[in-house]
Design a protein with these regions (language model features):
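A short, flexible loop at the N-terminus of ABC-type nucleotide-binding domains that lies
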Residues: 1-5, 9-20, 27, 68-70, ...
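The feature captures the beta-strand-to-loop junction immediately N-terminal to the Walker
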Residues: 34-36
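Helix-to-loop junction immediately C-terminal to a conserved catalytic motif
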Residues: 49
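Conserved ABC transporter NBD signature motif
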Residues: 57-65, 74
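Conserved ABC ATPase "signature" region
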Residues: 98, 113-131, 156
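Conserved ABC ATPase signature
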Residues: 110, 135-139, 143
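Catalytic Walker B motif of ABC-type/P-loop ATPase nucleotide-binding domains
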Residues: 160-164
Length: 260
């Protein structure tokens, strides 16, 4: 399944945030969206997920206009991890992750074996199986972040939309999230669009990078083509060095002035 934004313009009231944005993620492809604060990244995720209707342009899910699809079909197709944790605080971790199975269930009161299996797998993969019976309200921000990701994985959607999936996570769990998403893309052939702040993570995990600034796409291509000092410095307005890791061959990024 693919997802595509076609000349999207969007905003809030009279405040325009996105202007003529086009991008796409195909089956088996991870697209990272980078850009400074206020670039429109989270607004883009809201439009792609159907939470915000565009003022102009269309979002296509496998070639079909998202605005014309039933909510149930969208829920089965799109898994979303928003920027701010939206987990329900009155529930346990297991109950929240089970909510990811709702699009596949005829009744929330009827849990099937495949639902239990999907939830157990998501809990294990997100390293929160030991928290399954804990109340979400008792968890740290990083733990709640992993609950939100586990819910999206349990959903088994064909498209993942992630807004800063590694926010609030320590280094180990941030790497684990990258590995998990990469595995979903490669093993299940899903399409993924992920907003990232970590330039190094985009270089390591993504197939393509979209650079967003001022509500417009400034660059779109493989990491080695987009993660160039001249492009990044113009967008982020800080000194940036890019080098190639000798072992992996991947670019890595150093930001800010270096001094001894």
């Amino acid at each position: 399944m693919s997802i595509e934004a076609c000349e999207i313009s969007a905003g809030y009231g009279r405040d325009a945030v996105l202007s003529g944005v086009s991008l796409a993620a195909r089956a088996g492809e991870w697209v990272a969206v980078l850009g400074p604060n206020g670039a429109g990244k989270s607004t883009l995720v809201r439009v792609l997920s159907g939470m915000l209707a565009p003022a102009a342009g269309r979002v296509l899910l496998d070639g079909r206009d998202l605005q014309g699809l039933a909510r149930a079909e969208i829920a089965r197709s799109l898994g979303v991890v928003p920027q701010d944790s939206d987990v329900a605080f009155g529930f346990s971790v297991r109950e929240v992750v089970m909510m990811g199975r709702a699009p596949h269930q005829s009744s929330l009161l009827r849990v099937r074996a495949e639902d239990e299996s999907a939830v157990s797998s998501a809990l294990e993969r997100c390293d929160i199986a030991g928290l399954a019976d804990r109340a979400v309200a008792e968890l740290s921000g990083g733990e709640r972040r992993r609950v939100t990701l586990a819910r999206a994985l349990a959903q088994e959607a064909k498209v993942l939309l992630l807004d800063e999936p590694a926010a609030h996570l320590d280094a180990r769990h941030a790497v684990s999230v990258g590995e998990l998403v990469r595995e979903e893309v490669d093993r299940r052939g899903i399409a993924c669009i992920a907003v990232l702040h970590d330039l190094a993570a985009a270089a390591r995990w993504a197939d393509r990078v979209v650079l967003l600034a001022g509500g417009k796409v400034r660059a779109d291509g493989p990491p080695a083509e987009v993660l160039k000092p001249e492009l990044l410095e113009a967008v982020f307005e800080i000194p940036i060095r890019v080098a190639i890791d000798a072992e992996s061959g991947l670019p890595y990024v150093v930001t800010g002035r270096l001094s001894k």
